[in-house]
Curated annotation (Swiss-Prot):
Protein's cellular compartments: Cytoplasm
A GO cellular component annotation in the UniProt record: acetyl-CoA carboxylase complex
Observed phenotype of the null mutant: Becomes sensitive to thailandamide antibiotic.
Pfam assignment, any one: ACCA
Record field: transmembrane: none
Domain CoA carboxyltransferase C-terminal residue range list: 37-294
Xref: PROSITE patterns: COA_CT_CTER (PS50989)
Protein name, entry field: Acetyl-coenzyme A carboxylase carboxyl transferase subunit alpha 2
Task performed by this protein: Component of the acetyl coenzyme A carboxylase (ACC) complex. First, biotin carboxylase catalyzes the carboxylation of biotin on its carrier protein (BCCP) and then the CO(2) group is transferred by the carboxyltransferase to acetyl-CoA to form malonyl-CoA.
Length: 322
């Protein structure tokens, strides 16, 4: 556990794991059997982690969703899909590497995969624009969606972005049109679409690849119209109220499932997806398999009717007499 990055609220877990690592080093360097103490502390660490993650606050979930070791789109592609062949460029201007996509196989069935991609180090983060997609990324995604529709290939999207790139260059290249067109086109694509929020689901930047037939969120991911920090800056004129904003935004998977805004929650390993990315991928794959089975038998007309009904269900309200 030496290379694990612990969040602020995981301090007690980090201290326990540090003791375990120290005992293991001592055991290796001496003939003393410390296995009993190591096992005791390991069980205590696992229990503490489980208890802590069972009662995370919305703000703590935001921190987990942003964890630097959390699996990204290409990690899930490597674990879940085979024969992935990445496709580049929007055929109009450029190739935005904050969105990746291409052809792959899911259980030997051809499909199209599209998702946001962040970086692990400074160089990668700059190359991926820190996970903020530009208009070219959304146009590249739409090109792949249209390719999938042409050959009736199922589409899997993976959402993990703080939001669309807010730079002047993005506005000059018509960011709002790119997002709006994706929303419109995805609503009428005649092929199954399964969307999964794997980390941050930030506003229109997430929605632009988030319209589908089945919406999934990982247990400790978030989905919101605005980041807690930005919300705090607007409402309280101070970014230091991010925790209160997170509580008010209703951005967690369980809250959004209760509101009917997503369909399924994919549970994460104890301690979050970053603790065991491969196990997380196996758990998610089962949810994706079940989700695809539920929609792949529908013909194009049935698929569109069902999708339209889902979209029209969003935002319903009821008037009550005062």
């Amino acid at each position: 556990m030496t290379n694990v990055t612990y969040l602020d609220f995981e301090k007690a877990i980090g201290e326990l794991d540090a003791k375990i690592d120290a005992l293991r080093c001592s055991e290796d360097e001496s003939a003393i059997d410390l296995s009993e103490e190591i096992n005791r502390l390991s069980a205590r660490s696992e229990k503490l982690t489980k208890e802590l993650y069972e009662r995370l606050t919305p703000w703590q979930i935001v921190q987990v969703a942003r964890h630097p070791a959390r699996p990204y789109t290409l990690d899930y592609v490597n674990f879940i899909f085979t024969d992935f062949h990445e496709l580049h460029g929007d055929r109009s201007y450029a190739d935005d590497q904050s969105i990746v996509g291409g052809l792959a196989r899911f259980n030997d069935r051809p499909c199209v995969v599209v998702g946001h991609q962040k970086g692990r180090n400074t160089k990668e983060r700059a190359m991926r624009n820190f996970g903020y997609p530009r208009p070219e990324g959304y146009r590249k995604a739409l090109r792949l969606f249209k390719l999938a529709e042409k050959f009736r290939l199922p589409i899997f999207t993976f959402i993990d972005t703080p939001g669309a790139w807010p730079g002047i260059d993005a506005e000059e290249h018509n960011q709002s049109e790119a997002i709006g067109r994706n929303l419109m086109e995805m609503a009428s694509l005649q092929t199954p679409i399964i969307t999964t929020v794997i980390g941050e689901g930030g506003s229109g930047g997430a929605l632009a690849i988030g319209v589908g037939d089945v919406s999934i969120m990982l247990q400790f991911s978030t989905y919101s119209v605005i980041s807690p920090e930005s919300c705090s800056s607007i409402l309280w004129k101070n970014p230091n109220y991010a925790e209160q904003a997170a509580n008010a935004l209703g951005l967690t998977a369980h809250r959004l499932k209760a509101l009917g805004l997503i369909d399924k929650i994919a549970n994460e390993p104890v301690g979050g997806a970053h603790r065991d990315p491969q196990q997380m991928a196996l758990m998610l794959k089962r949810v994706l398999q079940e989700s695809l089975r539920n929609v792949e038998s529908l013909d194009a007309k049935q698929l569109l009717v069902r999708r339209h009904e889902r979209l029209m269900h969003y935002g319903k309200f009821r008037e009550t007499a005062v």
